[in-house]
Amino acid sequence: MKARATSAASLRALAAGALVLALAAPSAAAARDTLTIGITQYPSTLHPSIESMAAKSYVHGFTLRPITVHDAEWKVVCMLCERLPTIENGDAVPETAPNGNQGIAVTYRLRAEAAWGDGTPITADDILFAWEAGREAATGIGPAELYRSLHRITVIDARTFTLHFDKLTFEYNAINELRPLPAHLERAIWQADPRAYRTRTLYDREPARPGLWSGPYRVVATQAGASVTLERNPAWRGREPAFRRIVIRTVENTAALEANLLAGQVDMIAGELGLPLDQALALERRAATRFRFHIQPGLVYEHIDLNLDLPALADRRVREALVRAIDRDQIVQRLFEGRVPVAHSFVNPLDRMHDPALPRIPFDPEGARRLLEE
């Protein structure tokens, strides 16, 4: 339903969200020690900082832990660090950056139990290596702006380091994208040839190396284009995972993926990379007693981008008239069975920046006609 044109403006969304929808077999599956999950994409790389793919992020949710993350309430919290640095607690101190801008120095201390899957502690050197590789343009690690703004790292001790940014933002302490890299395994490969590192990384050549992983699970086997197999990480010091083994199986065709679920070849379909909503709703009508369905609106929104180079569309009244002329509530009811909200702005209601007081444009054909007559 998404249509696009060359423009930065957009017609207010038809519906907020590609849904996150999960399908799971009944509780009998929970008694087994292996969980098989079906998704529609296979990651092109397993390296934490090279390329961005939903399938890779899904695997990393089991196998890696970032320094910070946004929790379910969209608050920044520590995962690998002991406490979140803030200006108020003194761990973040505004400073003047080399470029003359207002910058900030942010100090983190890693948890003592944080370790790679081979038992090697995660240290400040792993952060330093990730930064060094990220600053090298030839390596192709992203996001580029993070590594540009982070102009210096001061290592205080094995677990403590200070990040120096050349600008002060409202999320100065959110370093979700600064992903630690196991320097004891990867640094020598990178130093040998930064440009070729993306094709020589152990994350793709030897992904079953335990020392690449820091989450409750580690990768033990991969079958290119078909599956990634995970097992519990013995070096993990958090709560023991529920399953001994997880198999993430790729089935790109959604009809075949549904057939795999019905045949019991997968135990669940991931909402992030699963069935389109219409197919999932049809399956729910047919098999509601066999599976548990969980539908959650996502943060993306279906919308139409408009080309403001066209004189007619450059007029705000025309764009508002288009919104008033579309019965978006009816679209949501007909296409999505009312499972998603109408998007009244580009900020999803799940986002903490959402303002419920913003004015809403209703379905108003007469109002649309008056605006066009002007």
Task: Indicate residue ranges for each PLM-predicted region.
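Extracellular/periplasmic solute-recognition and catalytic clefts
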Residues: 134, 152-153, 220-234, 247-310, ...
